[in-house]
């Protein structure tokens, strides 16, 4: 499943692509604790695509929905407000976590 599937047609006219990452997202849903996933950014929002047992799941976040992004021990950590908490991406297979975190944090300010 191609999780980096965002195209120009998905963007608002004012949006431009930013960095993206693929890897393993650590997030508990029922009895599963990790999923293959991707984060894709634009200058206006962040997309999260996840392979949930062969089914694509997409969630879109405004930057106002994100507290911060950081890199710890080669893992990307996205911190969301209360409710979702922190989601880690480990085993990053494409993209640069430091560049990604810096881009997201720049959009927050």
Residue ranges and their predicted role:
Residues 95-109:
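Terminal and domain-flanking low-complexity segments
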Residues 27-92:
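Phosphoinositide-binding peripheral membrane targeting modules
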Residues 1-39, 81, 103:
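Anionic N-terminal interaction surfaces
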Residues 16-25, 54-58, 95-96:
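Hydrophobic transmembrane alpha-helix bundles
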Residues 1, 7, 70-76, 94, ...:
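Generic structural signal for short, solvent-exposed loop/turn connectors between secondary structure elements
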């Amino acid at each position: 499943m191609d999780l980096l599937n965002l195209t120009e047609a998905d963007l608002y006219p004012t949006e431009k692509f930013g960095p993206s990452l693929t890897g393993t997202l650590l997030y508990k849903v029922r009895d599963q604790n990790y999923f293959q996933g991707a984060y894709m950014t634009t200058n206006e929002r962040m997309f999260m695509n996840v392979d949930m047992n062969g089914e694509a799941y997409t969630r879109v976040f405004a930057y106002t929905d994100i507290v911060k992004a950081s890199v710890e021990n080669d893992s990307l950590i996205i911190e969301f407000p209360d409710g979702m908490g922190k989601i880690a991406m480990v085993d990053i297979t494409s993209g640069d976590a430091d560049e990604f975190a810096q881009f997201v944090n720049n959009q927050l300010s």
